[in-house]
Amino acid sequence: MTASIKIQPDIDSLKQLQQQNDDSSINMYPVYAYLPSLDLTPHVAYLKLAQLNNPDRKESFLLESAKTNNELDRYSFIGISPRKTIKTGPTEGIETDPLEILEKEMSTFKVAENVPGLPKLSGGAIGYISYDCVRYFEPKTRRPLKDVLRLPEAYLMLCDTIIAFDNVFQRFQIIHNINTNETSLEEGYQAAAQIITDIVSKLTDDSSPIPYPEQPPIKLNQTFESNVGKEGYENHVSTLKKHIKKGDIIQGVPSQRVARPTSLHPFNIYRHLRTVNPSPYLFYIDCLDFQIIGASPELLCKSDSKNRVITHPIAGTVKRGATTEEDDALADQLRGSLKDRAEHVMLVDLARNDINRICDPLTTSVDKLLTIQKFSHVQHLVSQVSGVLRPEKTRFDAFRSIFPAGTVSGAPKVRAMELIAELEGERRGVYAGAVGHWSYDGKTMDNCIALRTMVYKDGIAYLQAGGGIVYDSDEYDEYVETMNKMMANHSTIVQAEELWADIVGSA
């Protein structure tokens, strides 16, 4: 171990901590070391560790966050070499609630709580839960659906080693969890010190160039194809409007997906996306056979160490202004829109119902209502609903209750999802599902809605978007809205292709 690397806590402190713990089931002891960033960014650190050009690489992820409303999430996270990957769904021969598997797996880990200086994620499960998993949470929504993308319904990496980048102190924190069910504390400490030292060596190695992904020549001007087309989507809108007028639902959220061939490496799509569409939830998840690339604006649900559950309904959108005055005027216009306010309040009520199902009703609160949140290109109406879990409920129960968001399904939620399944006839996959993490601490989680998210598989980027349909929605306008939502990501691909064509040439 190099002299400049200090592992914390030291072994004597860790032994003392182990002796002080009354709970004999505690078996995870996190240790860590700091590394000044030295101008090393999280995405370059990820490239050094993930080795994307290596065909024998393991799954990995990069989670980042961009500043919104002058608030910056403190940490970015990198994960490599998971101890185990949970994959479920028909493609894996496991058609069951993935949260049951995850909860059982994570029940075998119990982290020592009094290790100071750790970020909100210091080890745990990271990945996605697809929209289609709702059939396990709400069996009434189950329908026979065509599986176009052939992806796992859930994909979760269990990572004992996490590299966190602290945006405040501009330093990396390399964390490894010692599992005393698998080794003694002393042996585990030495192994952890070696793992941390090896990671530091890779991050500080300037003897070789940064291993950017290999990028072949770019084929320009490729086109996309929708799975339903203009006529098909407008028919979806018309059908849902009939159900709304009959009183079956108040709102429904149909979607369409486009397939766009591209010769870009998926990480080069992500690099451009994080620049042109900075968002609270930026992620690149390498599942080896496919990749998930996203810039989501919207929290689905999170929980903290005090069992407080939070969800953020977002509904109502207006563009950013060219000047501060125009920006504020547009925000006032959005606040004053009766249609946007009515739809938003409906989703807040839905969120309150979801929270009430698993939280003490006396703790359920609308913490923020109809506030404006500003993003890079748009402004949204945002609210916050929270509550404290009842003693018999867990974070997994909270996730099931809130999933999927009303903004991607409708209201009443179950009936809307039944109608959506019958109309779309295909699995949605990652779109409208959740991307995020579940900590080993047994309490915390943080999951965003998989919006503005792309799936890259076999040289094709899949983009998907939907829109909320109410009784007076216009079919053509709704079709255009979904296309506009997808075009933000499509433009990212086009711009990245043009940039890389200048560097590596065109095919």
UniProtKB/Swiss-Prot annotation:
It catalyses: chorismate + L-glutamine = anthranilate + pyruvate + L-glutamate + H(+). Keywords: Amino-acid biosynthesis, Aromatic amino acid biosynthesis, Lyase, Magnesium, Metal-binding, Phosphoprotein, Tryptophan biosynthesis. Transmembrane segments: none annotated. Its EC number is 4.1.3.27. The keyword Oxidoreductase does not apply. One of its GO terms (cellular component) is cytoplasm. InterPro entries: ADC_synthase, Anth_synth_I-like, Anth_synth_I_N, Anth_synth_I_PabB, Chorismate_C. The keyword Thylakoid does not apply. The modification Phosphothreonine is found at T223. Its cofactor is Mg(2+). GO terms for biological process: glutamine metabolic process; L-tryptophan biosynthetic process. Pathway: Amino-acid biosynthesis; L-tryptophan biosynthesis; L-tryptophan from chorismate: step 1/5. The modification Phosphoserine is found at S81. GO terms for molecular function: anthranilate synthase activity; metal ion binding. Tetramer of two components I and two components II. Component I catalyzes the formation of anthranilate using ammonia rather than glutamine, whereas component II provides glutamine amidotransferase activity. Present with 6510 molecules/cell in log phase SD medium. This is Anthranilate synthase component 1.
